[in-house]
Amino acid sequence: MKRLVKCLCMILALSFCLAIPVAAEETTPYGSSYFGSRDAYLWRTSSTSCEAWFEITAVRGMAELGAQFIEIEESADGVNWSVVATYNRANYSNLIKTNTSDHTSYVTYSKMKPNYQYRMYVRLYAKDSSGNIATSSMYGYFAN
């Protein structure tokens, strides 16, 4: 009887060990092993306009590198945000650079209102020579 209990305990212990879920995925910075560093920020140029800047560095040369799009958002209360402008790569060729490992660019927004807060949302983009694509998104705020 003692031997049976030991055997059952061993089987039960083994089944618990094998039933524990284990996460085994690799985590890379910025959601992609393509991106080395990245930054996004707004730069006020007047009381009614600002520049939305992004800087991106890839870990190696890319066929295409930059931003798929940039959105400018505004808020009267700092809680509820609305998109007031969208700049995409199809209409703004400066957002993507080819055959490079780094890219810095900006777009200008010129309809800022007094007493409103502004931020930018950017979707960064990298495409290697094999056609593999990686994206990473981030918000940017006023640097000045």
Residue ranges and their predicted role:
Residues 20-144:
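Low-complexity, Ser/Thr/Pro-rich intrinsically disordered linker/stalk segments at domain junctions
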